Amino acid sequence: MHYQNVRAAKFIDRPNRFIAHVELDGSVETVHVKNTGRCRELLVPGCTVYLEKGTNPNRKTAYDLIAVEKGSSLINMDAQAPNKVFAEWAAAGGFLPDVTAIRPEYTYGGSRLDFCVETEGRLHLVEVKGVTLEENGNALFPDAPTELGVKHIRELQRAAETGLDAVLFFVVQIRDIHSVAPNDATHPAFGEALREAAAHGVRVLAYDCDVTPDSLKIRREVPVIL
């Protein structure tokens, strides 16, 4: 996926989950943050961030904050991007060969899962999780407690137990990650649910991405450590 009209800026602060203050062209600009997660380890005063200019002239903020530099790494932190890049990748045959349909926001049981991917005679239920938390080259999810994430995992487990192909798919919005693991220190229940689901047939996959200031693309599979 690609962004348009991307600018570099310097991060100042984040007064709430939705906006941040940045320095752009010598002036302070209020921008929309496309990720309501904590991201405390990413948005550090003085770091370089990347902004996409919005196309709606009537919106309150002119720019969206989409990526941030952390050391030598560039991290895409757009919470909407993982689903978009998965859909592009799956449509191009990256997920499975012979895909006949990709249905987003698929209702199954009591949940709405991100995708139902159809191949000849079979349904594949996919829940996508974007990962931006990195420690020493390894990625962790979640960066904050997510009861909805636990609910999605349990729904995938029920699907797997009926014989459907159920997949939890981590899109790591960083390049050259060594592994992905549940962040048990932050949300033990998520890790417990994930390990139980995997033991009952849910496939747990993770892929890192090629990241530039104006693009994101799924790159290669990385190990998941449960």
Locations of the language-model features?
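Nucleic-acid nuclease catalytic cores
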Residues: 137-147, 154-186, 208
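OB-fold/S1-family single-stranded nucleic acid-binding modules
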Residues: 56-72, 218-219
